[in-house]
Swiss-Prot record:
ATP binds at G901, P902, N903, M904, G905, G906, K907, S908. Residues 212-339 are annotated as: Mispair-binding domain. Residues 58-70, 141-153 have a biased composition (Basic and acidic residues). Residues 1-15, 108-120 have a biased composition (Low complexity). PANTHER family: DNA MISMATCH REPAIR PROTEIN MSH3, DNA MISMATCH REPAIR PROTEIN MUTS FAMILY MEMBER. One of its GO terms (biological process) is mismatch repair. GO terms for cellular component: nucleus. GO terms for molecular function: ATP binding; ATP-dependent DNA damage sensor activity; mismatched DNA binding. SMART domains: MUTSac, MUTSd. This is DNA mismatch repair protein msh3. It comes from Aspergillus clavatus (strain ATCC 1007 / CBS 513.65 / DSM 816 / NCTC 3887 / NRRL 1 / QM 1276 / 107). Heterodimer consisting of msh2-msh3 (MutS beta). Forms a ternary complex with MutL alpha (mlh1-pms1). Belongs to the DNA mismatch repair MutS family. MSH3 subfamily. Residues 21-36 have a biased composition (Polar residues).
């Protein structure tokens, strides 16, 4: 009970009483001096003083930090009494206002004045230099107190009572707790109360039995959070608490940073670290329930692993259960990373970027990689690598097993092709591979235009045996079921079980990894296992993808200006993904290639306009990503409106061609088109059967209770619906009972602020006097009051329990429906794949319809014969017309071109144009040319550009030669090789020697089709060593005008025969706006060097002519050819 002053002197002013504790609370406790210790009363026990000081300290902290903003006058009065000035407290001798009568009488009978005190008990503990009380009694000796032992004992007892009452409900701490809000005791408010009691930012020492000074007792929610967090320390946890999702500790800091939300300060760690002992709660941040997936997507896109912890109980069912007084049960129900986020049909991609030339669309692959050191070391090092890549959004699985050299070009090629958003590394990687992975997944944006998330998994010495056992057990049940009636599935499963060792290790790790996210079912789709290195496709290595700008341009790494951007005219997301695969994996099978290009030709044919427009209209009506929708149904993560949309879309597709019974009935001559169209109506029967179970309007509005048609509802759903109807009927009958009690026949139920079945009674009517005391007043106004009767409260509780059970039954039935649809996943997926094929073919047909595109002619002979060919991307980006050029390469005739010409003359664009036309042709597309005859190339290799590899400690020239060495090892007579200015990274003599040796090896030994760009005019003499013209000199044509200072160069961008003997680098320097004086000096130096070289050549020519004149026997045919060549150079 609060202390009251019993003195006769006038009380201190209200302002003084309030300022005193506030000022002193800002200063730490000052230890008493020896003089002060001597002045302390000897008759008061030291334990009592310490308890009194601790109690005052707690009260002061509560007033500073924990007192609510709004307090009534009584609360303020009580707190003011607690912290009243000490001199006035001394005169009361520490006696409560409501003391026993004897004590009060004893105090009142004491007529002598209290002796003056140098410092009271409070000012002795909290000194403030400017306090008038401190100086009032300074230097005054306190006389001995003549109190009796009985009075001392009574005083001690009263101090103990005060300390005990400080933590009671009616003290300042209790007032702060009640104002802050305690947990509601009603069952209906359990969810809200759990949040208020456990999570609200409580000040120190707030709450009964939960003194958290120095990290004391934890609330039940905090215990739950710590228990879950310790099992998932690498995960950002989003925890459902009442009607919000909350972050705690370090997770709250991350959420505040990434989501731009408020973080309430507190503990960041979960290990009770001493550095946070002064904090009494965890840092926290919160988001609304309906915005969960919006914020989860942002965290996942930022590279975090996010876990969602949900409440497994509802308020109504918890109130009716046996654990109504325990906290809500919570469990980690969902885990998400960039590669495993499938809970939103759009995933992390957002709108289609390719159409606007934005960033390259993410493939969404998770790639698992492991390696062992095969043999060798240094530059001869060979490693054995296994990979498994999974795309959870579509169900595709890619695997490969290969050896790689010290440059790791094979690993880089696969990483660039697959473009994973997440890597799982099994075991330790070699330094070279580790550096490559770091380069592609570093903190900065990588070549994919995104950050790659990396997880590492340990690898035991017995990993191979354990992995094989794990994979075998995973597929055991499926293999047993398939062996009876499905030979194809059995063969596919046997193929999976006989994968190479490194692939099996990766597959086992990926199964375990995906199980953590509940997506392990994807590996049961064995039909979609694909080998990366299938020889049915052209090989485009990492350098080729970058140099030829297959997926991204080299300027800003967006899709605009890439080959994929040029060919992409698709209308659907799944069609766009398939086209991306086509672009990166051109065909090698001539028959398949001819089928595809014939299909494009038929779609381009004006006679097929009706059929083509019908297909375009059908694709235009597909607004959802069916491939992702189907895999979400397979995972059981599809929503009700989404399921309705998918089934209705599939029904539209099937009904459009319901009249097609066979591939010959669809109006297309091409077998590719015929089979694709004929597969569309095969799903109609199943789709209609599923749609007949669904209430369309309820599904569209996401009404789980009416989702199924009445005839399709389960017994459990019907039972709870009848229970709800019964309760509502009883509520209606009870209205008449309430009317009889009030003797007012017009009683009706009303709903106010979401609270149903309220009985309104006017405050001025006679009925208000007849309201029983058992009725609960819920709300009211000046004119009326609203009540719940005890019967209504009980019936509403029963109805809520039925509603909760009904919701669970509806979710269970919906999950069963999704599982039933998932049985037909492969049938539906094949239909969507057929539609994607049609979309890609229509896209290629749109390209073929552009002016200047021609259908290529394919031959088994290795050659590239193009007349008036053009660069496909530059042509679309340029406003002016592109200058076409001819190309004639044949493995039996001229198989190499030595390309020279001035800087900026178009050499690199020309060789890229040749490579891109060859790739487009093997994709099955028309090519930008007047005519084209193409052989089946097995690979395109490029060595272009100049850059170093600082991570690997390799110089520009080292990188250049290492890439060249890889090309020489991999190239075949059916490959196209492009080498751009090889040897420029070293001295002229060494560069010429290396370039000449490599070119000779390519032409004579490997016999690949080769385009070799150089500024070394000396290499042009190599053509003389190839009498059958296997190597030819060509140059980029230009015209010169003016002389000296006024010399100008005009680039014609045409390929001509012969050699360009000058590079005209000074022209580029002038275009780059180098200072004029610098250009003048450069021109003089260039002229001097050219004159020196010309004089040397002339001197050698004159010497040779003199020798011939003196000895005619030396003038053989070879000598005369060299003589003529020297004269031409002059």
């Amino acid at each position: 009970m609060p202390l009251r002053s019993s003195q006769s002197s006038p009380p201190a002013s209200q302002s003084f009483k309030r300022k005193q504790p506030t000022i002193s609370s800002f200063f730490t406790k000052k230890p008493p001096t020896s003089q002060e210790k001597a002045q302390e009363p000897e008759d008061e026990p030291a334990a009592s003083r310490r308890q009194f000081a601790n109690a005052l300290d707690k009260a002061t902290r509560v007033k500073e930090h924990g007192a609510p903003a709004e307090r009534d006058e009584e609360q303020e009065e009580e707190e003011e009494d607690i912290v009243a000035p000490a001199p006035k407290r001394i005169k009361t001798n520490g006696v409560h206002e409501k003391e026993p009568a004897s004590a009060a009488k004893e105090v009142s009978s004491a007529s002598r004045p209290a002796p003056p005190l140098a410092s009271s008990q409070r000012t002795e503990l909290y000194k403030f230099a400017s306090s008038p009380a401190d100086g009032a009694g300074a230097g005054v000796d306190r006389p001995e107190d003549p109190e009796t032992k009985q009075r001392q004992a009574e005083r001690e007892r009263l101090h103990q009572l005060f300390v005990k009452k400080l933590g009671g409900a009616d003290c300042a701490v209790g007032i702060g707790r009640s104002a802050g809000g305690d947990a509601p005791s009603g069952a209906e408010e359990a969810a809200e109360g759990d949040e208020d009691e456990e999570v609200a930012p409580a000040p120190a020492a707030k709450g009964r039995g939960s003194k958290k000074a120095g990290g004391g007792k934890l609330t039940p929610l905090e215990k739950q959070v710590i228990e879950i967090k310790r099992k998932h320390m690498d995960t950002v946890l989003v925890i459902e608490v009442g009607y919000k999702y909350r972050f705690f500790g370090e997770d709250a800091r991350i959420a505040a940073k990434e989501l731009s939300i408020v973080c309430i300060p507190g503990k960041m760690r979960f290990d009770e670290h001493p550095s946070e002992a002064h904090l009494d709660r965890f840092a926290s941040a919160s988001i609304p329930v309906h915005r969960l997936h919006v914020h989860v997507k942002r965290l996942v896109a930022a590279g975090y692993k996010v876990g969602v912890v949900r409440q497994l109980e509802t308020a109504a069912l918890k109130a009716a259960g046996d654990n109504r007084n325990a906290p809500f049960s919570r469990k980690l129900t969902n885990l998400y990373t960039k590669g495993t986020y499938v809970d939103d049909v759009e995933g992390l991609e957002g709108p289609t970027p390719a159409a606007s030339g934005g960033a390259s669309p993410a493939t969404g692959y998770l790639l698992c990689i492991t390696e062992t050191n095969a043999k060798g070391w240094g530059n001869d090092e060979r490693v054995h690598v296994g990979i498994v890549a999974v795309q959870p959004n579509t169900g595709d699985i890619i695997y490969d097993d290969f050896e790689d050299g010290f440059m790791r070009s094979e690993v880089e090629t696969r990483l660039l092709h697959i473009a994973p958003c997440e890597l799982v590394i099994v075991g330790e990687l070699s330094k070279a591979t580790e550096k490559l992975v770091q380069h592609l997944s570093g903190s900065k944006l990588n070549t994919f235009g995104d950050k790659v998330r990396v997880e590492r998994v340990g690898k035991k010495k017995t990993a191979v045996a354990e992995s094989h056992s794990h994979v075998a057990n995973f597929y055991a049940s499926k293999l047993k079921a398939a062996s009876v009636d499905d030979t194809q599935t059995s063969n596919l499963l046997q193929k999976v079980l006989t994968l190479p060792e490194q692939v099996t290790v990766c597959l086992s790790a990926m199964i375990e990894h995906m199980t953590e996210y509940g997506l392990e079912h994807i590996f049961q789709l064995t039909k979609y296992f694909q080998h990366f290195s299938s020889r049915s496709h052209m090989l485009l290595n990492a350098n080729t993808l970058v140099s030829l700008e297959i997926y991204q341009n080299q300027t800003d790494h967006s899709t605009k200006g890439s080959l994929f951007w040029t060919l992409d005219r698709t209308q659907t997301r799944f069609g766009q993904r398939l086209l991306r695969k086509w672009v990166g994996r051109p065909l090698l099978d001539k028959s398949r290639l001819e089928e595809r290009v014939n299909a494009v030709e038929e779609l381009k044919n004006p006679e097929k306009t009706v059929q083509v427009e019908r297909l375009k209209r059908l694709l235009g009506r597909i607004k959802s990503d069916l491939e992702k929708n189907l895999i979400r149904i397979y995972y059981g993560k599809c929503t009700r409106p989404e399921l309705l949309t998918v089934l209705q879309t599939l029904q539209t597709i099937a009904q459009e061609y319901a009249d097609v019974k066979s591939p010959e009935d669809n109006g297309f001559a091409s077998p590719v088109l015929g089979e694709a169209v004929a597969s569309l109506p095969t799903i109609l029967k199943d789709v209609v059967a599923f749609l007949n179970k669904i209430n369309m309007h309820a599904a569209r509005s996401d009404d789980k209770y009416e989702f199924f048609r009445e005839s399709e509802e389960t017994d459990e759903i019907s039972e709870h619906k009848l229970g709800i109807a019964s309760v509502e009927h009883e509520l209606e009958e009870h209205r008449a009972v309430a009317a009889g009690i009030l003797k007012w026949p017009k009683v009706v139920y009303v709903t106010s602020s979401g609270i149903e079945y309220l009985i309104e009674v006017e405050n001025t009517s006679n009925a208000i006097k007849r309201v029983p005391a058992s009725w609960v007043k819920v709300s009211g106004t000046k004119k009326l009051s609203r009540f719940h009767t005890p019967e209504v409260i009980q019936l509403l509780r029963q109805r809520d329990q039925h509603k909760e059970a009904l919701a669970a039954a509806c979710d269970k039935a919906f999950a069963a429906l999704l599982a039933e649809i998932a049985v037909n996943y492969q049938l539906f997926r094949d239909c969507v794949q057929a539609l994607a094929t049609l979309d890609c073919l229509l896209s290629l047909a749109a390209i073929a319809s552009q002016p200047g595109y021609v259908k290529p002619e394919y031959t088994d002979h290795t050659c590239i014969c193009v007349e008036q060919g053009r660069h496909p991307m530059v042509e679309q980006l340029l406003l002016d017309s592109y200058v076409p050029n001819d190309t004639d390469l044949d493995t039996d005739q001229t198989r190499a071109l030595l390309v020279t010409g001035p800087n900026m003359g178009g050499k690199s664009s020309y060789v890229r144009q040749v490579a891109l036309i060859a790739i487009m042709g093997q994709i099955g597309s028309y090519v930008p040319a007047r005519s084209a005859k193409l052989g089946m190339l097995d690979a395109v290799f490029t060595r272009m550009g100049a850059f170093d590899n600082m991570l690997a400690g390799e110089s520009t020239f080292m990188v250049e030669l290492s890439e060249t060495a890889d090309i020489l090892k991999q190239a075949t007579p059916r490959s196209l090789v492009i080498l751009d200015e090889l040897g420029r990274g070293t001295s002229t003599h060494d560069g010429v020697a290396i370039a000449q040796a490599v070119l000779d090896y390519m032409v004579r030994t490997i016999r690949s089709l080769t385009l070799f760009i150089t500024h070394y005019q000396h290499l042009s003499n190599m053509t003389q060593s190839f009498p059958d013209h296997e190597l030819r000199n060509v140059h980029m044509r230009f015209t010169e005008s003016g002389a000296g200072q006024d010399e100008e160069i005009t680039f014609l961008y045409e390929v001509g025969e012969g050699v360009a003997h000058r590079s005209y680098g000074l022209n580029v320097a002038r275009l780059a706006n180098l200072p004029a004086p610098l250009l003048d000096v450069a021109k003089l130096k260039s002229a001097e060097l050219e004159e020196q070289i010309r004089r040397r050549r002339l001197a050698r020519l004159l010497t040779a002519v003199g020798e011939v004149m003196s000895d005619p026997a030396k003038g053989d045919e070879d000598f005369l050819e060299r003589l003529m060549s020297t004269a031409e150079q002059l």
